[in-house]
């Protein structure tokens, strides 16, 4: 096509981060970038549908916002794609559910911190990214609207529990990403915008 969304400096870094994380984990993957026309849920959801139409089987989404009572209808419109693994970042503001991570049709991806741990088999220790005092950290919590899916058996939330899985997200050990659009070049990124594409790439490796 020839009609593309306008370039956006706010999204440029996010896009570069997502592409770099997928290619780092799965260098042989065929990567398809689908951009939404705006940041509205309808346009973002339409981009997910478009990716599925184009043949994508593993889709990463690094965005989210406050929940809304209309989210359950968006679930069926945009995220109910049997046979397609859809990952969504859980957010970077600590405790509190965000959408579309709350959708029962997606894998909600939280974040961890890695630290060197010499003398251990793995060589690293891993803990949840965030602090007990609040502020920046991996999003988590109980959905206010989305029903608990049958595959969740925890008792902590009456409705959908977030997150499902996690991957490294701490900006303190972030990824150097080159942003060529209205930016200063190399920047270090982290957050669950990094962990969501990691998990999508792992799904792709697993087939």
Regions found by a protein language model. Give the residues of each.
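Extracellular protease catalytic domains of secreted zymogens
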Residues: 34-207
């Amino acid at each position: 096509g020839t009609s593309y969304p306008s370039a956006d400096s706010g999204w440029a870094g996010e896009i570069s981060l997502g592409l770099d994380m997928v290619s780092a984990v799965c260098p042989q993957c065929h990567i398809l970038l689908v951009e939404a026309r705006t940041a509205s849920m309808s346009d973002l959801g339409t981009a997910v549908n478009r990716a599925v139409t184009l043949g994508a089987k593993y889709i990463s989404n690094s965005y989210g916002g406050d929940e809304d009572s209309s989210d359950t209808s968006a679930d069926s419109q945009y995220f109910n794609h049997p046979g397609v693994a859809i990952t969504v970042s859980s957010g970077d503001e600590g405790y509190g559910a965000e959408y579309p991570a709350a959708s029962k049709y997606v894998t909600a991806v939280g974040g961890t911190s890695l630290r060197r741990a010499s003398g251990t088999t793995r060589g690293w220790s891993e803990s949840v990214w965030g602090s007990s005092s609040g502020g920046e950290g991996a999003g988590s919590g109980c959905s206010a609207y989305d029903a608990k899916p049958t595959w969740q058996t925890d008792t902590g939330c009456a409705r959908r529990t977030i997150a499902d899985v996690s991957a490294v997200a701490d900006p303190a050990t972030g990824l150097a990403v080159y942003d060529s659009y209205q930016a200063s070049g190399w920047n270090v990124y982290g957050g669950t915008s990094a962990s969501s594409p990691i998990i999508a790439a792992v799904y792709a490796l697993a087939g």
